[in-house]
């Protein structure tokens, strides 16, 4: 059975790299607790984020929106909201539960988020963002960070970005920013289009780091390979990978060796799937549905013979009544025998 990883939020010695050196982005409907458990089997070092959770859901919701596995560490909670007191309250709850970081969403452009007065629209209210960050900083000892864009609508000059960062850094005492290297259109584009249509401007984020060298700055947007991540790390403190890490999670098996420690082992995907079995059995015994777990592992064998059969078997069988670990075992047997044998299957 896979043993839980442990990660201290207050290590005895200063870590070689910032916590944000490599992270998997918060992605709504994707980075739930099942996803994070699986990703942690693939990398010990990557910082994992929750889906965005609103302050209202945490304070008034019936579900436990702060639930996570102890194995998730290092793990960050992304909050959506704009009320400093509510954010401070939620940050304190999260710290008590053991989260390693609190992140404020100032980058999501969806209409639903805007109607709640949080997300990317807050870029136009730097003073309010600063108040929110300061309230959380005063409430907790763990890092409080911001994830934002390089601009919104017509407010897309480099000067605007600098003024926003400077205000939040000075008034809010925020030291860590993750910048999605695209502007956001608050109307006219869907959230999906806002991740694809506005052009990427990596150089603008590099310049931001040069102009604010004391800040920890990570980049997000369009990162598809670890080679690209390494290139960004020549200029910045961290890289956040989103859709590629989710749709092709095999990339995470290389993260620890490529970005943290050249002597770190590379996790093999077959053993990671097998290590997931006890978790699946435990979750199913508590009423979870297999499909809610297996949807996160569909892309693990991307590019390997048998990957299509693997995906098809899981997609067609995981939602059937009574589906259990045997469905995953059957799917794994469809992966190329030569690959399976090469990793000791």
Curated annotation (Swiss-Prot):
It holds the Pfam family Dus. It comes from the Bacteria. Keywords: Flavoprotein, FMN, NADP, Oxidoreductase, RNA-binding, tRNA processing, tRNA-binding. The keyword NADP applies. GO terms for molecular function: flavin adenine dinucleotide binding; FMN binding; tRNA binding; tRNA-dihydrouridine20 synthase activity; tRNA-dihydrouridine20a synthase activity. Its EC number is 1.3.1.-, 1.3.1.91. It is an enzyme of class 1 (oxidoreductase). Its cofactor is FMN. It catalyses: 5,6-dihydrouridine(20) in tRNA + NADP(+) = uridine(20) in tRNA + NADPH + H(+); 5,6-dihydrouridine(20) in tRNA + NAD(+) = uridine(20) in tRNA + NADH + H(+); 5,6-dihydrouridine(20a) in tRNA + NADP(+) = uridine(20a) in tRNA + NADPH + H(+); 5,6-dihydrouridine(20a) in tRNA + NAD(+) = uridine(20a) in tRNA + NADH + H(+). The record marks 105, 192, 195, 308, 311 as: Interacts with tRNA. The active site is at 108 (proton donor). Catalyzes the synthesis of 5,6-dihydrouridine (D), a modified base found in the D-loop of most tRNAs, via the reduction of the C5-C6 double bond in target uridines. Specifically modifies U20 and U20a in tRNAs. HAMAP family: DusA_subfam. Belongs to the Dus family. DusA subfamily. This is tRNA-dihydrouridine(20/20a) synthase. It comes from Yersinia pestis. The gene is dusA.
